[in-house]
């Protein structure tokens, strides 16, 4: 048997499926495309997650786009994290061009231009349906992980949530959270100490600094109402029955990784808490693509990485698949990389000694093969080509295959501002979520309580007992005057906020 026939038999047997699948492309050997060697991705294994990696300009985004189209055609909803802004073209039909026609001819497939049902979402100032979550929904554990708090600080946050629950104080946004922090440190300190124990002002100040740091990355836009219902991500187009493609526009978050990580972890936790258990179903209920995944992992604390790892392990039983897109597999922590069933590896570039080391490590992550020199091939792959292995329907890794990938059917480019406006005008989610709600919550309730208590406190306050001590300072003299004290408190609070903001900015990781 010739090497080519042996290769063809290996690929056809390794990628055979009984159930439904997506066609990723056609296998290649020695630059030849085998039109009868389909590279198939079984739908039932999509909840085992995946990785799409490769250097800039090698075709990662187009691969992501093609897989998204295939899922939508199968009626499976998709959520895309669009960091670069080049995925919105899914909403418009693609264009023919000579290179595209030549690729389709080599692969033995027909190109059909098509658009897909798209909803644009945002957690920042980008245009789209706004996603929000309340601080209460976020919860003390997740909030503590994001803020990178120690055990003592986590305990204070948990106590703060308990106090708000016990006293009917809604925690909707960060303004509420900061107000409660100030309350338990100042006016409410005695009440807190009696019910929950003494809280150190140094601890609450540290927590406040970290909240301010998060705010400076734009988190105030994310926390609040109306809360996003993750079940809205499961929609299909009522006319075509295609799965809705929800594109999260994150173009302005590239330099704000903490907010990106906050949003991602919150979303995954909410999906896990909301979706019912389905086990290993014939097809996923939702597939999530996280582009530029290194933004989550680069500066993440160990506690945050552990939280992400746990959610990735558990969420597959909810029928949810998660695919990370990044430049090299080494961007993804080993504990998470080991859980990713599908691996699509585009070309890597070897410019430095570190690059060569990364390529060697990447080659070791793939199944051994008699048909390729994996390490060499990783640097020789053309644009729109990739090394692929997926999980078979039996759960085993398929043979490694150099693959010419199918091209997207939708536009390989961005929408114009006018097209974005038209899309948002038709959006069901924009009408539902872009109303800003600011109902009475902890901030207003505690502000009112302070205002009610202040006059009584000044009128009924006992004179301090006389005792021998040093001559009063100018500060203590001023604070004997109620008006001066109130003015001074306000001034000091504003000065402190400004100072803490600077400290938050300079805090190292």
Go through the PLM ranges and name each one:
Residues 1-16, 28, 130-136, 344, ...:
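Conserved P-loop NTPase motor module
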Residues 1-55, 62-74, 78-79, 84-109, ...:
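Basic- and hydrophobic-enriched, low-structure N-terminal and domain-boundary segments
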Residues 2, 66-68, 91-109, 310-396:
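Conserved ATP-driven motor cores of ASCE-family P-loop NTPases powering translocation/secretion/packaging/pilus
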Residues 44, 53-55, 81, 121-123, ...:
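Generic beta-strand/beta-sheet core signal
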Residues 69-72, 76-78, 85-310, 380-381, ...:
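P-loop NTPase motor domains
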Residues 83, 300, 304, 328-332, ...:
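Helical "lid/switch" subdomain of P-loop NTPase nucleotide-binding domains
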Residues 459-509:
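Long amphipathic alpha-helical segments used for membrane anchoring, targeting, substrate engagement
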């Amino acid at each position: 048997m010739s090497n080519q026939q042996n290769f063809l038999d290996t690929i056809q047997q390794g990628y055979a499926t009984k159930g439904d699948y997506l066609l990723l492309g056609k296998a290649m050997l020695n630059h030849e495309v085998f039109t009868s060697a389909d590279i198939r991705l079984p739908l039932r294994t999509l909840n085992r997650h995946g990785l799409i990696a490769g250097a800039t300009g090698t075709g990662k985004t187009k691969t992501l786009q093609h897989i998204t189209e295939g899922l939508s055609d199968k009626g499976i909803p998709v959520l895309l994290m669009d960091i670069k802004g080049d995925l919105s073209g899914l909403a418009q039909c693609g264009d023919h061009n000579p290179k595209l026609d030549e690729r389709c001819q080599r692969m033995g497939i027909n190109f059909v231009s098509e658009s897909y049902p798209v909803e644009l979402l945002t957690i920042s100032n980008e245009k789209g349906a706004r996603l929000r979550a309340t601080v209460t929904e976020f919860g003390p554990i997740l909030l503590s992980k994001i803020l990178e708090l120690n055990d003592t600080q986590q305990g204070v946050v948990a106590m703060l949530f308990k106090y708000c629950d016990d006293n009917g104080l809604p925690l909707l946004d960060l303004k509420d959270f900061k107000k409660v922090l100030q309350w338990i440190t100042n006016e409410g300190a005695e009440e807190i100490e009696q019910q929950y124990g003494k809280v150190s002002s140094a601890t609450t100040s540290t927590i406040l600094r970290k909240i301010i740091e998060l705010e400076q990355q734009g988190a105030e836009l994310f926390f609040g109402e109306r809360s996003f219902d993750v079940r809205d991500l499961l929609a299909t187009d009522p006319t075509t029955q295609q799965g809705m493609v929800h594109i999260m526009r994150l173009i302005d978050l590239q330099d704000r990784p903490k907010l990106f990580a906050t949003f991602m972890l919150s979303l995954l936790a909410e999906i896990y808490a909301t979706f019912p258990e389905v086990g290993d179903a014939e097809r996923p209920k939702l597939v999530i693509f996280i582009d530029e995944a290194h933004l989550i992992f680069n500066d993440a604390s160990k506690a945050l990485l552990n939280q992400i790892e746990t959610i990735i392990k558990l969420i597959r039983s909810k029928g949810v698949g998660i695919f990370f897109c990044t430049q090299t597999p080494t961007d993804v922590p080993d504990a998470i990389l080991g859980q990713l069933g599908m691996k699509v590896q585009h070309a890597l570039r070897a410019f430095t000694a570190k690059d060569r080391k990364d390529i060697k490590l990447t080659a070791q992550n793939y199944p051994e093969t008699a048909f390729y020199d994996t390490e060499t091939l990783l640097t020789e792959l053309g644009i729109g080509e990739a090394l692929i292995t997926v999980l078979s329907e039996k759960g085993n890794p398929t043979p490694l295959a150099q693959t010419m990938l199918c091209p997207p059917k939708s536009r390989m480019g961005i929408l114009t501002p006018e097209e974005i406006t038209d899309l948002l005008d038709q959006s069901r989610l924009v009408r539902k979520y872009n109303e800003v709600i600011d109902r009475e919550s902890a901030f207003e309730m505690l502000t009112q309580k302070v205002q009610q208590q202040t006059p009584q406190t000044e009128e009924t306050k006992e004179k301090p007992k006389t005792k021998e001590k040093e001559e009063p300072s100018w500060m203590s003299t001023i604070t004997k005057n109620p008006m001066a004290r109130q003015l001074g408190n306000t001034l000091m609070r504003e000065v402190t906020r400004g100072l803490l903001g600077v400290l938050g900015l300079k805090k190292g990781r």
